[in-house]
Structure formats: structure tokens, C-alpha cells
């Protein structure tokens, strides 16, 4: 321990913070160096934080499929089958990482393909999974990607975004999740191979193959195009989980056609028009349907886990508006609370909002724009009004036939002014 003599010549100092032995409780000596108790505590805090942020380290740290599914239920309404598929796939993926090298049997990675109409929850499912597992997450739009060397975004820029999301911690990035949206937009432009290069369709599928299967990507820290003088970060993509999503409009016709015969004439079977919903037909999806849609066989092979999502009906959309932890109605009610007013939606108003989203074919994604449109004038006027106690939205407001009803603290009622 340190010498506590008052002689200044013998005073010892911490080699890290510079404090003297008289300013700290303990000073620990090593070969030609000293460290105080405060610096030791700081080092322990850093180590604890690093351990906490390093993601899942043991099998006990991987949530069970049921635990993952329960958290997904808090944020995503419906889609129970897709949640079960995702929960099992993600649990197995991180269990595989935590037991790598402990057995002679090498467990292959199972990337995931989400298929469902616009606004059904594909992106939200992927985002919520990353939050549950506390791993870096990034999203990419497949329509902006091109083959290397062409104008557009390189595929390796996806890995750069993941690296940025992990604050350039390469080890954490290598255990992250990448969500690639709109993969149905990078299909072959025709069934037959062309003599001209398809740099934004099949070419992007080819470019994605390597990073999805596993490769060491050389990523320029500042992004942009590569050049020989640049320094690169090496990121191994072997353990990165890739989730691809798309609406795949028209895929249901391919599925329906597969079940029909092509015979004609008097002896042919006459089949009635298929009246099943899109989501129900997606449940009968086979890999060959994706090939006919325009995905190349190698790309389909990299996505062994397929989860199909269904259209959201009116009841599901109303539930999305009101029930999740971050439900839209709760968000707008909080905004109005900041203006000391209560926002109330009648039941018929909620049904009408859900009905408009279905008419627009925008699913849950279109709900916010509908609410913004309904509440715009009221949100404009409210900060300048006094004593407004409650704002009521009914079906007539949603249909555009009336403005939200303002109820004042002295119980005087009048329609909101049009801004």
C-alpha cells in the first residue's frame, strides 16, 4: 500500500488520474506504476458496461421462443403464425452462435424471408426482434442496391450501416440483424437470361448471396466507393442474421395457377375462380413459386425459413390503433395532454379510420397519415385556445363531414374552427 508520510518527496500519485495518495482512499502499487481505488472502480464500470452491451453470451441469455413471441405480442398485432416461425428461427440462430465450436456438428445459418402485403408488420417484427435480443440492427431498401461498380448503393454498404449501428464494434456487428426490405423488387426482369446485365435485379440477388451465406466484407469506414489507398474494416458476415421482406404482389396468382390444370376442350375439368384471401394462399407457398416470381434458385436457397403474413382486417387495425404499448391513439393522446387537453375517439370513429386504411390498401402503415389528416386543424388551433378540456373525434369527423368537437372546461361545446 501507499506510504502515507506527509513528506512531499515521498508522496505517491496515481499513474492514471494523477491524484496523490492523500486525495484517495487507497493507492495500489505495481512495478513502477500506481492506481487509485477511484480508477479501479471506473475500470470495473467500463468492463461491466462492455459485458452488458456485448449481446447474448450464454445459452441462458437467449430468450426462449415463447418469451420472444410474448414480447412480439406487445408490439405487433395478429400474425401469430409468423411470430412463431420467427421466434423459433431467432432462438435457434443465437443458440447456435453461443454453442459454436462445442460440437463436431456444424449448425448452418437459417436466414428468414417474410412475405406479406404492405403495412402488415414485416418491418416492425424485425425491429422488435433486434430490441428483444439487444443486438445491432439495420434496415436496407433492396431497390436502391446495385452491383458493385454501378451507380447506386453497394451491397457492402448494408454491412457499413450495421457497423455504424454497433458504434463500430466489429464483434457486436457480427452478431447483428439486417432487414432487407422490398426484395420482391429485385426479381429477374424476365424468365429468360438476357445478354444485357440486369444490375438492379438479378445482379443484386447475386451480390447479396455472398454476404448472406458468409464472407469477410471489407468495409470503408466512411462509406462511399472503395479506392486502393483506403483503409478497410474487416467484418465477417457468417453469423449475421438476414431477414428479407417483401409484398410479392402477384405471387398469389402463381400459387393459384400451380393448383390448376392447363387442359382445354370438352374433357377438361372446369375449376371455379379461387375466392381465398391472399394471406390464405401465401400459406400454400412452395419454393418453386418464388422461382417463377423471379428470384434465382441460389437466393431462395439462402432463405430456408419462410414466414407468411396475412392482410389485416378492420378489427386488427382497430386493435393496432389502441392496444400496443406504443399505439398511435396513445401517442396522439399524449400530444394533446401536453396541451392540457384530453383526446377521445368514439368506437365508430376507430372503425371508420380502420376502414379508410383498408380502402387505401396501406395496412397499418397508413393509419398515421389518416390521423394526421383528421387532427391537423385541431392541432394547429389548440395551442392558441384556452380552457379546452377535451377533443372528441367521431365518425363524421373521419368522413370529413365535421370537425372534432371541442369541450371546454366550463362545459361549453362548439365545433373546432377550420384552419
From Swiss-Prot:
Pfam families: AAA_2, ClpB_D2-small, zf-C4_ClpX. The gene is clpX. ATP-dependent specificity component of the Clp protease. It directs the protease to specific substrates. Can perform chaperone functions in the absence of ClpP. The lineage of its organism: Bacteria, Pseudomonadati, Pseudomonadota, Alphaproteobacteria, Rhodobacterales. One of its GO terms (biological process) is proteolysis involved in protein catabolic process. PANTHER family: ATP-DEPENDENT CLP PROTEASE ATP-BINDING SUBUNIT CLPX-LIKE, MITOCHONDRIAL, ATP-DEPENDENT CLP PROTEASE ATP-BINDING SUBUNIT CLPX-LIKE, MITOCHONDRIAL-RELATED. Residues 2-55 form the ClpX-type ZB domain. InterPro entries: AAA+_ATPase, ATP-dep_Clp_protease_ClpX, ATPase_AAA_core, Clp_ATPase_C, Clp_protease_ATP-bd_su_ClpX, ClpX_bact, P-loop_NTPase, Znf_CppX_C4. Keywords: ATP-binding, Chaperone, Metal-binding, Nucleotide-binding, Zinc. Disulfide bonds: none annotated. The keyword ATP-binding applies. It comes from Dinoroseobacter shibae (strain DSM 16493 / NCIMB 14021 / DFL 12). ATP binds at residues 117-124. This is ATP-dependent Clp protease ATP-binding subunit ClpX. The keyword Ion transport does not apply.
Amino acid at each position: 500500500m501507499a506510504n502515507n508520510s506527509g513528506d512531499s518527496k515521498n508522496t505517491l500519485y496515481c499513474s492514471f488520474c494523477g491524484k496523490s495518495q492523500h486525495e484517495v482512499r487507497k493507492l495500489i502499487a505495481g512495478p513502477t506504476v500506481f492506481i487509485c481505488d477511484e480508477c479501479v472502480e471506473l475500470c470495473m464500470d467500463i468492463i461491466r458496461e462492455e459485458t452488458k452491451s456485448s449481446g447474448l453470451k450464454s445459452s441462458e441469455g437467449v430468450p426462449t421462443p415463447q418469451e420472444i413471441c410474448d414480447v412480439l405480442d406487445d408490439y405487433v398485432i395478429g400474425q401469430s403464425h409468423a411470430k412463431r416461425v420467427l421466434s423459433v428461427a431467432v432462438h435457434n440462430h443465437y443458440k447456435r452462435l453461443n454453442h459454436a465450436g462445442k460440437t463436431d456438428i456444424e449448425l448452418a445459418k437459417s436466414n428468414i424471408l417474410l412475405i406479406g402485403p404492405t403495412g402488415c408488420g414485416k418491418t416492425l417484427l424485425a425491429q422488435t426482434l433486434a430490441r428483444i435480443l439487444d443486438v445491432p440492427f439495420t434496415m436496407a431498401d433492396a431497390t436502391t442496391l446495385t452491383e458493385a461498380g454501378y451507380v447506386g448503393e453497394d451491397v457492402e454498404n448494408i454491412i457499413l450501416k450495421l457497423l455504424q449501428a454497433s458504434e463500430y464494434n466489429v464483434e457486436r456487428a457480427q452478431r447483428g440483424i439486417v432487414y432487407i426490405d422490398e426484395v420482391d423488387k429485385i426479381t429477374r426482369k424476365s424468365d429468360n437470361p438476357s445478354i444485357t446485365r440486369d444490375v438492379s435485379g438479378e445482379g443484386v440477388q447475386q451480390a447479396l448471396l455472398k454476404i448472406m451465406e458468409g464472407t469477410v466484407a471489407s468495409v470503408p469506414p466512411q462509406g462511399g466507393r472503395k479506392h486502393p489507398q483506403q483503409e478497410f474494416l474487416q467484418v465477417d458476415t457468417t453469423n449475421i442474421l438476414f431477414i428479407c421482406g417483401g409484398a410479392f404482389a402477384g405471387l398469389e396468382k402463381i400459387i393459384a395457377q400451380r393448383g390448376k390444370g392447363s387442359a382445354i376442350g370438352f374433357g377438361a375439368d372446369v375449376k371455379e375462380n379461387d375466392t381465398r384471401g391472399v394471406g390464405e394462399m401465401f400459406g400454400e407457398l412452395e419454393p418453386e413459386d418464388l422461382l417463377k416470381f423471379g428470384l434465382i434458385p441460389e437466393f431462395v436457397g439462402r432463405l430456408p425459413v419462410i414466414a407468411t403474413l396475412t392482410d389485416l382486417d378492420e378489427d386488427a387495425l382497430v386493435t393496432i390503433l389502441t392496444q400496443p404499448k406504443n399505439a398511435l391513439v396513445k401517442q396522439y393522446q399524449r400530444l394533446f395532454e401536453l396541451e392540457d387537453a384530453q383526446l377521445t375517439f368514439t368506437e365508430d370513429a376507430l372503425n371508420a379510420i380502420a376502414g379508410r386504411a383498408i380502402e387505401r390498401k396501406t395496412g397499418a402503415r397508413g393509419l398515421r397519415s389518416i390521423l394526421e389528416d383528421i387532427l391537423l386543424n385541431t392541432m394547429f388551433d389548440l395551442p392558441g385556445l384556452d380552457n379546452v378540456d377535451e377533443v372528441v373525434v367521431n365518425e363524421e369527423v373521419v368522413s370529413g363531414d365535421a370537425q372534432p368537437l371541442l369541450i371546454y372546461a366550463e362545459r361549453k361545446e362548439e365545433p373546432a374552427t377550420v384552419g
